[in-house]
Amino acid sequence: MMSISLNLTMAFLLALAGVLIYRSHLMSTLLCLEGMMLSLFILMALLISHFHMFSASMAPLILLVFSACEAGVGLALLVKTSNNYGNDYVQNLNLLQC
């Protein structure tokens, strides 16, 4: 169990580093966010089953639902941005620019 949770924590940190490094393109940022959410989902499900906390068994499912909603909104934003500007740069999403 320890090596699995360590691997999932490393996957989360790697995806977080990916968000920080590849933050110029929206598609790369969305992929890294999805990796973070999936590693959190698996880690939460494993911890709940390991510690026999079945009263909190709905939490991973709720996290997965929010992850799907985040992916849908992100892809809609990606399509809208690429149609308007022709690229997927995050700097195009800054509403404070003229």
Curated annotation (Swiss-Prot):
Its EC number is 7.1.1.2. Pfam families: Oxidored_q2. It is an enzyme of class 7 (translocase). GO terms for cellular component: mitochondrial inner membrane; respiratory chain complex I. InterPro entries: NADH_UbQ_OxRdtase_chain4L/K (IPR001133), NUOK/Mnh_C1-like (IPR039428). It catalyses: a ubiquinone + NADH + 5 H(+)(in) = a ubiquinol + NAD(+) + 4 H(+)(out). Core subunit of respiratory chain NADH dehydrogenase (Complex I) which is composed of 45 different subunits. Core subunit of the mitochondrial membrane respiratory chain NADH dehydrogenase (Complex I) which catalyzes electron transfer from NADH through the respiratory chain, using ubiquinone as an electron acceptor. Part of the enzyme membrane arm which is embedded in the lipid bilayer and involved in proton translocation. This is NADH-ubiquinone oxidoreductase chain 4L.
